[in-house]
Swiss-Prot record:
It is an enzyme of class 1 (oxidoreductase). Pathway: Porphyrin-containing compound metabolism; protoporphyrin-IX biosynthesis; 5-aminolevulinate from L-glutamyl-tRNA(Glu): step 1/2; Porphyrin-containing compound metabolism; chlorophyll biosynthesis. Substrate binds at T49, C50, N51, R52, S109, E114, G115, Q116, Q120. Homodimer. GO terms for molecular function: glutamyl-tRNA reductase activity; NADP binding. This is Glutamyl-tRNA reductase. CDD domains: NAD_bind_Glutamyl_tRNA_reduct. It comes from the Bacteria. The lineage of its organism: Bacteria, Bacillati, Cyanobacteriota, Cyanophyceae, Synechococcales. The keyword Amino-acid biosynthesis does not apply. It comes from Prochlorococcus marinus (strain NATL1A). Its EC number is 1.2.1.70. Catalyzes the NADPH-dependent reduction of glutamyl-tRNA(Glu) to glutamate 1-semialdehyde (GSA). The active site is at C50 (nucleophile). During catalysis, the active site Cys acts as a nucleophile attacking the alpha-carbonyl group of tRNA-bound glutamate with the formation of a thioester intermediate between enzyme and glutamate, and the concomitant release of tRNA(Glu). The thioester intermediate is finally reduced by direct hydride transfer from NADPH, to form the product GSA.
Amino acid sequence: MHIAVVGLSHRTAPVEVREKLSIPEELVERSFNNLKKIDQILEVSILSTCNRLEIYSLVKDPQLGIEAIKSFLLEFSGLEDEILSPHLFNYVQEKAVSHVMRVSAGLDSLVLGEGQILSQVKKMVRLGQDHHSLGPILNRLLTQAVSTGKRVRSETNLGTGAVSISSAAVELAQLKLGQAHGRDQLMTLETEKVAVVGAGRMSRLLLQHLQSKGCCSLTLLNRTRKRAEDLSAAFPDIQIDCQLIDELDSCLSLSTLVFTSTAANEPIIDAEKLINIDRKPLLRLIDIGVPRNISSDAKSVSGIESHDVDDLQEVVSRNQEARQKLALEAEGLIEEECRVFLEWWDSLAAVPTINCLRSSLESIRKEELQKALSRMGPDFSARERKVVEALSKGIINKILHTPVTKLRAPQSRNDRRDSLDVIEKLFNLDVSSSLNKPKNN
């Protein structure tokens, strides 16, 4: 068995490729079912965010398992192999373990230390559990990754002052406004006519950061008015005009700055729409949706300044050097957590031998107990029989305690293998046969 991860992220693929592998809610169950049908996969879960799609799995054979997952990604995305493959990465065993720990800690994020990824890793664990696709190995790994993410944020300064995708989007708007006025600095958004399209979690974060940057009024559009009004109620200090998304054209004509963050699978704004509306001389569009809410052809329209999640790098790079230094604090903790998991993983190699040894001694115990009880005759009471049986079980457990503890203790693979070989020879254990023996129903 091997732990493997296959996927792509903002580091390896542009948004136009990533959006092809964004898994909408309505396709999550089907995706899990298709992955579980793959013979090579023993356990699996999916991490899908705006910046990454990663399949974590326990596979029988690493090469065959990775190829099978790659085939799933090709079929799901509809992309040709020569287009998708250059953007995919895969890690096995130690590298896979280290990768998920780093992802959960925010070290692999566009914004170093951002907190939202931890919630997304928690969701990955929950999805795997809900779809009954996690076994003891991946469940232990992913649960420990969540704990590692929490530990990094509580024991280091990496999470202090970290920005999110939403805050970076607001900062990008401030930066572009400043550059338009000939200044390489962030400007307040007080005078901008702002609109936010979508009323989900990302939009909630957008509103938080817009409020902190001086925005005191905006238009909020959503597919359902109630959800927009519920979100609006959480921000009483902002004057929010809630509209249905049907009013998008009217909103675009009145706004100077529009943020989009919806779950739509196709663009809701394109060049044709922008050409056919009466709008302000300059309209800034910032799209943090994946798949993208704004078509790439919007950039070709005069008077339109359109940005997507990949453009956030301009903002992130302004303070990334300082955050890189903070990330060094987390590396030691991640190495420690990886070592703990791998020691546990290695200790599983002893389980078949321990089970075989326990079974062998249990057979001897039962055989010898039966001989002893038969000699006692009918005068031996049921209570006395229970006492003798408990005594025999206690002796076996005492005999097993020290060798089992030693075998499970942290040690090098070679040392553990040597110990297993000695025990198997001393007790004449046939571990391979016991593994292949069918279980009693």
